[in-house]
Design a protein with these regions (language model features):
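Active-site region of glycoside hydrolase catalytic domains
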Residues: 1-46, 89-91, 99-465
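Aromatic- and Gly/Pro-rich amphipathic surface segment
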Residues: 32-67
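N-terminal, well-ordered alpha-helical segments
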Residues: 60, 67-70, 100-103, 107
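Catalytic domains of carbohydrate-active enzymes, especially glycoside hydrolases
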Residues: 61-82, 289-293
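Glycine-rich, proline-tolerant flexible connector loops at the mouths of alpha/beta enzymes
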Residues: 81-94
Length: 465
């Protein structure tokens, strides 16, 4: 048995997002976003046809939820402001009901000793802006900067930790390469432009925050999937893994921390003649406006081998033209989500930030496991005994602790998520929360065994294992 103690004032908590938790009520003034729209078009694409209007009803239950956060040991909590709730058309008029809701929500958190961390964009493009191209359009960058400035003005007295994007690679992958987010295109030229505009928008908002006299910190949340070559002694596998890393990790990590794009990526997009449209002064903006704080979402690694399968010319070019995914035998799996569990990956990411990214201040902003059918684990008192989740978090925290001991500037750990929430097209198929949500009983909340356990970890600022 070993005692793992974390640094003083360590952030213990969880993360969620507006579109995955808030739900809608008839007179809330919220505008349409791409998820509302896609669900209206194709409800059958969503598990059990549960759409974004339902979710976990945080809009009306947030006071109860904050008490449950307190009961589960949170000292910090991240959510996002829904752009389409605050500014229903994406630009123009502000919805005062949204202002009241978010101010009340953030105040409730603070009054209960929980610091709100607020993300500005979580895959939820307002529909009127998507109809003009979404992140493909320069207009969206300008609209986003105005929206962010409104958020800083309206909530800056309550919120001191801001994030420009959550997982900005996901709208690129889902919306413009692999068809799991609206608008479901397959077009690498568009994907490059979308990623470029997201990076530019982030830098512009960071500049606005720093120049606005605000007294907090601003960063970005990136899902980092370390790319491991099949054979570290095979130069072709190593090269393929480096390219995958440039596409999926460094495309946002390098601009956010170093103010520049990875050379491997620049060479590929130049060679393919799919360079984004760049305006004069853009690259200086990106170079000069880097983050204060990095949020790291870690779920799984990426296993890569040199390209062996034929290139699919129907959709060429694609990132996958440069590598194949490697199905490593005997890996540990979460069978419900189909994801590999590789705890050391979290240590490798943190070590990378220390060795190659100036030991930037960072925290684990998401880590967790989704499990289907958790009602199987309900005990006689109605509590879900999710020992598998406790084991998952413990095993990852051991590696976080090791990285900190070695000098990594990691200041917190947030699990995904607080209460079971709506996971996009998967809806409520896989449950991730410390707190169960019973959709059949009007979203009734029950703390799981992991939530009670997490409170002891937070109170002791560590654990024995």
């Amino acid at each position: 048995m070993k005692t793992y103690t974390f640094p003083e004032n360590f952030w213990w908590g969880s993360a969620a997002s507006g579109p995955q938790t808030e739900g809608r009520v008839s007179d809330d003034g919220k505008g349409e976003n791409i998820w509302d729209h896609w669900y209206e078009l194709e409800p059958e694409k969503f598990f059990d046809q549960v759409g974004p209007e339902k979710t976990s009803q945080v809009y009306t239950k947030y006071k109860e939820d904050v008490q449950l956060m307190k009961e589960t040991g949170h000292n910090t909590f991240r959510t996002s402001i829904q752009w389409s709730r605050l500014i229903p058309e994406g630009t123009g008029e502000i919805n005062q009901k949204a202002v009241s809701f978010y101010r009340d929500y953030f105040t409730e958190l603070l009054d209960n000793g929980i610091e709100p961390f607020v993300n500005l964009y979580h895959f939820d493009m307002p529909l009127p802006l998507q109809e003009k191209g979404g992140w493909l359009s320069r207009e969206t960058v300008d609209a986003y900067v105005s929206y962010a400035a409104a958020c800083f003005e309206l909530f800056g007295d309550l919120v001191k930790k801001w994030f420009t994007h959550n997982e900005p690679i996901v709208p690129v992958e889902g919306g413009y390469l692999y068809q799991f987010h609206y608008p479901n295109h397959i077009n690498m030229k568009e994907a490059v432009q979308v990623g470029y505009h997201e990076n530019l928008a982030s830098a512009k908002v960071i500049k606005a925050y720093h120049e606005g006299g605000h007294d907090g910190e601003i960063g970005i949340i990136l899902n980092l999937t370390p790319s491991y070559p099949r054979d570290e002694t095979n130069p072709e596998d190593v090269k393929a893994a480096k390219i995958a890393d440039a596409f999926f990790n460094r495309s946002f990590l390098d601009p956010a921390v170093k103010g520049e794009f990875p050379q491997e990526l620049i060479e590929i997009v130049k060679e393919l003649a799919i360079m984004p449209e760049i305006h004069e002064g853009d690259l200086e903006f990106i170079r000069e406006n880097t983050i204060d704080l990095l949020g790291i979402n870690y779920y799984q690694p990426r296993r890569i081998k040199a390209k062996e399968t034929p290139i699919n010319h129907e959709h060429s070019p694609m990132p996958d033209d440069y590598f194949d995914n490697y199905d490593m035998p005997n890996k540990k799996m979460n069978p419900y989500r189909g994801w590999e569990i590789y705890e050391k990956g979290i240590y490798d990411i943190l070590t990378n930030t220390r060795e190659n990214y100036g030991n930037i201040k960072c925290y684990i902003s998401e880590n967790g496991m989704g499990v289907e059918g958790e009602e199987r684990f309900v005990n006689s008192e109605g509590i879900i005994e999710d020992d598998y989740r406790i084991e998952f978090v413990t095993d990852h925290l051991k590696y976080v602790h090791q990285a900190i001991q070695e000098g990594t500037n990691c200041v917190g750990y947030h699990m995904w998520t607080c209460m079971d929430n709506w996971s996009w097209t998967n809806a409520y198929k896989n449950r991730y929360g410390f707190i169960a949500v019973d959709l059949a009983q009007d979203g009734k909340r029950t703390i799981k065994k992991s939530g009670r356990w997490f409170k002891t970890v937070s109170e002791k600022n560590g654990f024995d294992a």
